[in-house]
Amino acid sequence: MKPLHSQYQTPDISLPFRQLQKHIPFFHHISKQYFLHHISFCFSPYRKINNNLEQQTQAYFDELFVVNADPNWPECTLANIGSVVAGGTPSKSKLEYYADQGIAWITPKDLSGDKSKFISHGENDISELGFSKSSATKMPAGTILFSSRAPIGYIAIAQNEVTTNQGFKSVIPNKNIGTAYVYFLLKNLLPTIEGMASGSTFKEISGTAMKSVPTVMPDADIIQLFSDFCEPVFKEQEVLEAENKHLSALRDSLLPKLMSGEIDVSELDL
């Protein structure tokens, strides 16, 4: 059986516009509005498949660790599940602390604008010098980024080595725990974490409080069962998100050309 994403062909934005026509199932003689509407329509299959996969994995987590949770599983805290890591911000007044292609540096704003499950870079990267002059910490791929303030609870999975600003209390999963379990565990614990937050201006969960969030330690074989189930699903979701971003880039590259009249779609034979 072909991977789900292979059922849909993604346009290559490097192709000449005439060649792009054959990739997109539009009708003849269309308006700009109709053209843009159908580019937006192309996002739908990827989103639906991705959402369905997310619902399946969430349901399996609930089945294993909520509905059928073993009352004999020992109590523990997040500190027993993985390493809780804070972040830092290099001085904004030092331009040399930032780079176009440097160390990935994520802020809550990056997660608010991009609802993807996986993230590789934010709007800005920092330089090695900026990293050395801040309290930012390098975290490996598979780390679960968790925003700790304004708001609490943005969650994403690092696709590569990343750093964050101080608006995160991220979790590097222990090797015997794995990314998938910690990702869904944090989603499940969000009400508890919000209840442990404090602050007069805005609520924030401190590093100490985050480490002390209560949970349980399921049997290792159950965690492994869940990890094995999630591994191919997560890989599929990464591909779907990449293809969705590719379509977004296509739309964004064509929009100004359509609006300026550089591209005329009214007489295209699609």
Annotate the PLM regions.
Residues 6, 16-18, 31-33, 38, ...:
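Non-catalytic DNA-recognition/assembly elements of restriction-modification systems
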Residues 1-21, 25, 76-218, 269:
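DNA target-recognition domains and sequence-specific DNA-contacting regions of bacterial/archaeal
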Residues 25-26, 31:
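Ser/Thr/Pro-rich low-complexity tandem-repeat tracts
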